[in-house]
């Protein structure tokens, strides 16, 4: 096994951070720890509660054979701000590229409060690499800060923003559709997003808010990728978390679930909001591997390949080839 690299090289990303934010005082005290011990990578923000890669296999009954093993990496709820600095986002991008996904899906809330955050975070995300490209939808914070400005910034980085639209993916002679909708309450139009997709065609929907899963299930969507909930962000022992007002948000807080024949994965996200704290709810980078489902309905729950909730985790267990 070749040598492993610390993520990111400190001088390189510190220079980027200083370029966009100046030399921060508070940010220096909130910087994440980087260490490499015994062939394992630790990437843990002491306030953010750690970062893990969740590798999970998803069985889809309508997935064509040509997309067997297709890997989707999901990044959600980045919330770039003073408390989620650019060097942390850059580290996540570099880690994501090491996982060599077929598609990167960005499920919204790139920024928290400031329009000045849009261009810098978009430039960092422009470094994402995937065989089938990078697709994105916008979240509620993105619409509050400036949806058009963010969409333009992402497009300049060759990131396709699916605003009530869809895209056709082709692989080994097979078709797979990826649709995306604007956020719930900000113009989400599922009918427009899937218009033109053949009936019964395998379709993956990107929707920032899991409240849209019921509508997706009614329309036969195969898989929904969402975020928004942060997994609760702070998880109290015994009490758990109380998040959201809708039945969908209360039920679909994090991880894999299903509603009828429609499966959903809700990412805990990589950032924080309101307070720079995660407790008993580490940030995550989901890596979802799709497989054609050829079993009976009772066995349709996904097979867990590996969960990496808490750093350190071994890069070799995730199939990451070192340089």
Describe these PLM feature segments:
Residues 40-48, 75-88, 111-116, 142-146, ...:
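Acidic/histidine-rich helix-loop elements
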Residues 73-76, 103-109, 133-140, 162-165, ...:
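Active-site neighborhood of phospho(di)ester-bond hydrolases with catalytic His/Asp-centered motifs
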Residues 110-112, 140-144, 167-169, 183-186, ...:
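Solvent-exposed loop/turn segments at secondary-structure junctions
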């Amino acid at each position: 096994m070749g040598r492993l690299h610390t993520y990111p090289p400190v001088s390189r990303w510190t220079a980027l951070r200083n370029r966009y934010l100046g030399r921060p005082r508070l940010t220096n005290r909130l910087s994440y720890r980087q260490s490499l011990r015994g062939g394992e990578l630790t990437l843990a923000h002491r306030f953010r509660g750690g970062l893990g890669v969740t590798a999970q296999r998803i069985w889809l009954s309508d997935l064509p054979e040509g997309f067997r093993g297709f890997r989707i990496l999901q990044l959600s709820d980045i919330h770039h701000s003073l408390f989620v600095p650019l060097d942390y986002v850059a580290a996540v991008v570099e880690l994501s590229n090491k996982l060599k996904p077929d598609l990167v899906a960005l499920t919204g809330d790139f920024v928290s409060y400031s329009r000045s955050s849009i261009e810098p975070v978009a430039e960092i995300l422009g470094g994402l690499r995937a065989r089938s490209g990078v697709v994105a939808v916008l979240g509620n914070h993105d619409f509050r800060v400036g949806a058009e400005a963010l969409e333009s910034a992402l497009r300049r980085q060759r990131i396709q923003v699916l605003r009530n639209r869809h895209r056709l993916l082709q692989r080994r002679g097979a078709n797979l559709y990826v649709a995306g909708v604007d956020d719930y309450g900000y113009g989400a139009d599922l009918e427009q997003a899937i218009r033109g997709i053949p009936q019964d065609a395998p379709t993956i929907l990107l929707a920032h808010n899991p409240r849209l899963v019921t509508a997706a299930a009614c329309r036969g969507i195969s898989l929904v990728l969402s975020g928004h909930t942060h997994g609760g962000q702070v998880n109290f022992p015994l009490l758990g978390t109380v998040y959201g007002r809708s039945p969908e948000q209360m039920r679909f807080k994090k991880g894999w679930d299903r509603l009828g024949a429609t499966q959903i994965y809700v990412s805990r996200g990589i950032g924080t909001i309101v307070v720079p704290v995660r407790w008993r709810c580490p940030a995550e980078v989901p890596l979802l591997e799709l497989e054609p489902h050829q079993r009976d309905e009772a066995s349709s729950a996904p097979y867990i390949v590996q969960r990496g909730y808490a750093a350190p985790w071994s890069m070799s267990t995730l199939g990451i080839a070192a340089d």
